[in-house]
A protein has these predicted regions:
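Short, charged beta-turn/beta-strand-edge "cap" motif at the junction between a beta-strand
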Residues: 201-205, 219-222
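Basic side chains
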Residues: 26, 234-235
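Catalytic-core "active-site belt" of small-molecule-metabolizing enzymes
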Residues: 1-171, 176-177, 209-212, 220-226
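Conserved small/polar residues in nucleotide/adenosyl-binding loops
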Residues: 227-233
């Protein structure tokens, strides 16, 4: 699926057939340069299943289909959101947020694909998320998340990539607003508190080898993951 509208339909149909518990939703395609490059109008969102979310510091096995690793801001949203009326705005959004945390997302395809040529590629693969690792959460207080320095590094591979939360669809709070309004429009109701992952502040960082990746976001703290590489099966 190259066209995002068709991919959205496919994703929603597939998600409706999956009976696994959903822990939240992710924003994808939130980098404005990527939106312009691929001539898309806006990001999209996808469901995130409980089995794909791990505790801080856990290990993740990757393979050839893995695109890379991301660092993002995630929010815990109160169950009361589902009974709210009207659209979510930047003025009323704070009352639905209970916690905020740094998060690592390992991204890659389930299908045999390489690279990103359209949002349809990502969307038809459920947003191409493999695993999420949530760092220590903090009780939410209003503060400016729109200009926080971020960094993800792996000392073993001599990798270090700097970023900023202002690359995430204006800012992570705006990305959250986008997702919540899409969830509301699609009449999703988890009937519980849930997480929203707002998109990468460092782009998609290639994983050059195994080791510990540490993600740091100013004012929020750190999150880490131990990356293992699956050995190809011999025939």
């Amino acid at each position: 699926c190259k066209k995002i509208n068709e991919a959205q339909k496919l994703r929603k149909l597939c998600e409706s057939k999956i009976k696994l518990p959903v822990i939240g939703f992710k924003a994808a395609g939130t980098g404005i340069p990527l939106i312009k490059k691929l001539k898309e109008k806006e990001p999209f969102y996808a469901s995130v299943y409980s089995r794909n979310v791990l505790k801080n510091g856990k290990s993740v096995k990757i393979n050839k289909s893995t695109l890379g690793i991301e660092l993002e801001v995630c929010y815990k949203i109160k169950r009361s959101f589902f009974s709210s009326k009207g659209i979510i705005t930047m003025k009323n959004i704070s009352k639905y947020i209970s916690h905020i945390a740094p998060c690592i997302e390992v991204v890659g395809y389930r299908q045999r694909k390489k690279g990103i040529t359209s949002f349809g590629d990502l969307c038809s693969d459920f947003g191409a998320n493999i695993k999420f690792l949530i760092g220590p959460k903090k009780k939410y207080k209003k503060f400016n998340v729109g200009n926080l320095k971020t960094n993800i590094s792996n000392k073993k591979n001599n990798q270090s990539v700097n970023g900023n939360t202002n690359t995430v669809y204006i800012n992570p709070l705006n990305s959250l607003r986008f997702v919540l309004n899409k969830v509301k429009k699609d009449k999703k109701n988890l009937n519980k508190d849930f997480w929203v992952f707002t998109g990468s502040s460092v782009g998609v960082v290639p994983i050059k080898g195994k080791g510990i990746f540490i993600g740091k976001i100013d004012k929020l703290g750190s999150v880490l993951s131990l990356i293992h590489i699956s050995e190809p099966t011999r025939r």
